[in-house]
């Protein structure tokens, strides 16, 4: 019996899907706690690529119970497409459950997301424009539509008319946008409700009972620590809590249930969208890492910004999440890059150095990275099965990251397939 959380330690896209998939293969229950279809997990298994946005990665295992918690905002249109995609590949959905408390992303949320970003102009946040922020706004304004409402047509119609009327007023009178046909939305989304009704159940109760029965549970986080609404690089963050504490809130479980918290990082750093990025590489090395690592967004297709590994960031994540261990992905991408730099501290404008991540954006923007240079490696490490098989400089790199981050590196990804993992 165990309960573990998998958390991103950087700005997302760390390869959590791969680590989650490996752990999910050993779990009885896999739970998604927060976020929406703005997040994407890519899992490569048996030559088949699965791109999951809302459905937990455990769906690939027929005996694994897959749960979507109350902290998630669910886009029914995209969700049904994902259901169709899984079914077309022969994946059973019998073990899928959705908490009735989860909030629903509606068309007006998506419209308002885009209009708001457009209104901000050069000060835009760089959202995925999938309505996540506006959906969470309604949740905390206590005016949101939940999955329970969606699967009860009369309740849904009443709430949709009320919400839609107000949102159309904002869309047309504040932003000058085109109004949404509310009745058409009700008709369309009522059908989505019928489709997903059979999956609705109380996730908090299911998880609690599974724990009492001694089952192995894994909680998968979406996004990452530096996108957390409180502990990320605000305002360039998501609208929920991707940190470990957010998992407990988003699924309705107590923190004493959790046995292990695993943080996932890349062997370098990437970021999508705007905001400070101390170790960013705007040169040929950055382009090489991007192309070798396939650094393009699962959800948006946007090219990711690339940079050297930042130990200041990961140390912040170790502390904020209470990490038990780390998994480092895409070590193979760094083969042939040359000497490797690691950010060990930040230098402030007055010349002083700090080793803790700044709490506010304004301070971070003024920081310059302080690097330590390590010997690179040219060998192909994709077939290595153990830590001892790695080149000496490769092992030294991992050991240095472990020392700087103050957390054991227990897993090393050395290729895209789920089998390309070294455990130590």
Task: Describe the predicted segments one by one.
Residues 1-424:
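Non-transmembrane, aqueous-exposed alpha-helical and coiled segments at domain scale
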């Amino acid at each position: 019996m165990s309960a573990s959380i998998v958390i991103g330690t950087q700005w997302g896209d760390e390869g959590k899907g791969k680590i989650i998939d490996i752990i999910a293969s050993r779990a009885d229950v896999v739970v998604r706690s927060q976020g929406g279809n703005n997040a994407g997990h890519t899992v490569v298994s048996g030559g088949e690529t699965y791109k999951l946005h809302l459905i937990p990665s455990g769906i690939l295992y027929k005996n694994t119970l897959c749960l979507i918690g109350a902290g998630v905002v669910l886009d029914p249109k995209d969700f049904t497409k994902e259901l169709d995609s899984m079914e077309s590949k022969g994946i059973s959905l019998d073990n899928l459950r959705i908490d009735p408390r989860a909030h629903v992303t509606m068309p007006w949320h998506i419209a308002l997301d885009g209009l708001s970003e457009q209104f901000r102009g050069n000060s835009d946040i760089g959202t995925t424009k999938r309505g996540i922020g506006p959906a969470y706004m309604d949740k905390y304004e206590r005016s949101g539509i939940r999955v329970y409402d969606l699967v009860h047509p009369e309740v849904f119609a009443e709430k949709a008319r009320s919400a839609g009327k107000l949102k159309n007023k904002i869309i047309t009178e504040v932003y000058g946008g085109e109004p949404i046909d509310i009745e058409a939305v009700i008709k369309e989304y009522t059908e989505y409700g019928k489709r997903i009704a059979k999956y609705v159940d109380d996730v908090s109760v299911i998880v609690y009972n599974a724990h009492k029965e001694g089952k192995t549970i894994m909680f998968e986080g979406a996004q990452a620590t530096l996108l957390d609404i409180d502990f990320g690089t605000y305002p360039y963050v998501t609208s929920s809590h991707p940190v470990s504490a957010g998992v407990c809130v988003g699924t309705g479980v107590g923190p004493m249930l959790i046995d292990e918290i695993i943080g996932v990082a890349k062997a370098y750093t990437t970021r999508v969208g705007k905001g400070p990025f101390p170790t960013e590489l705007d040169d040929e090395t950055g382009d090489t890492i991007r192309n070798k690592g396939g650094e393009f967004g699962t959800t948006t297709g946007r090219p990711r910004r690339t940079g050297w590994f930042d130990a200041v960031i990961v140390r912040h994540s170790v502390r904020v999440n209470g990490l038990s261990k780390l998994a480092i992905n895409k070590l193979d991408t760094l083969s042939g890059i040359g000497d490797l730099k690691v950010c060990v501290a930040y230098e402030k404008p007055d010349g002083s150095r700090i080793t803790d991540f700044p709490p506010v954006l304004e301070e971070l923007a003024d920081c310059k990275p302080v690097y330590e240079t390590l010997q690179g490696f040219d060998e192909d490490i994709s077939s290595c099965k153990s830590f001892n098989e790695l080149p000496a400089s490769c092992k030294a790199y991992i050991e240095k990251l472990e020392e700087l981050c103050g957390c054991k590196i227990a897993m090393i990804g050395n290729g895209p397939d789920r089998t390309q993992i070294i455990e130590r």
